Amino acid sequence: MSEQSSSSRYQQLQNEEEPGENAQASADAPPPYSSIAGESSGLFDYKDELGFPKPPSYNVATTLPSYDEAERSKAEATIPLVPGRDDDFVARDDFDDADQLRIGNDGIFMLTFFMAFLFNWIGFFLSFCLTSSAAGRYGAISGFGLSLIKWILIVRFSTYFPGYFDGQYWLWWVFLVLGFLLFLRGFINYAKVRKMPDNFSTLPRTRVLFIY
């Protein structure tokens, strides 16, 4: 009798613990996937409406450039846009003394102008060869042009040189126009050179070639 009562009591305790364990197991179990998908679908739709970018596909994300493409892009990144120009263009505020000596001033221009005008071609060669500035050489060109006009007029209207232009007046006009063009060329080019310090003062350093 005692054994039967103990076994029945043991079975009764086992029956009482089973509902509790089943309830705990059901509470610890994760919810089904269908319920999660239904609850979170609204959240995903809300993110899509906000305009967040979608991640790329697996093929796009895992596509790597080839070796040649990687080397080409690396070489393009190392090559400067304008090679070898940094040394030529140096910012400065105004022309330095060396540039001013190469341009010259009004005094040198007038000196070489009168040398070429008074001493003709001898003064032209002396003033053109002895001066290295633009003002001196343009002054020599302008003075030689005016000297050429002077001698053409002297020969044309003087009684000491008869018969020089008889029947060849076109030659007189050629030399007259040539002297006038040389005279204007010297003055105009020197005026342009004089304006260069003002025009290039705010620009990078520029090398200018003077063609006489």
UniProtKB/Swiss-Prot annotation:
Residue window of motif PPxY motif 2: 55-58
GO cellular component labels: endoplasmic reticulum; Golgi apparatus; Golgi membrane; perinuclear region of cytoplasm
Extracellular compartment residues: 129-134, 185-212
GO MF term list: WW domain binding
Membrane topology listed for this record: Multi-pass membrane protein
Cell compartment(s), UniProt: Golgi apparatus membrane
Protein known as: NEDD4 family-interacting protein 1
Gene: ndfip1
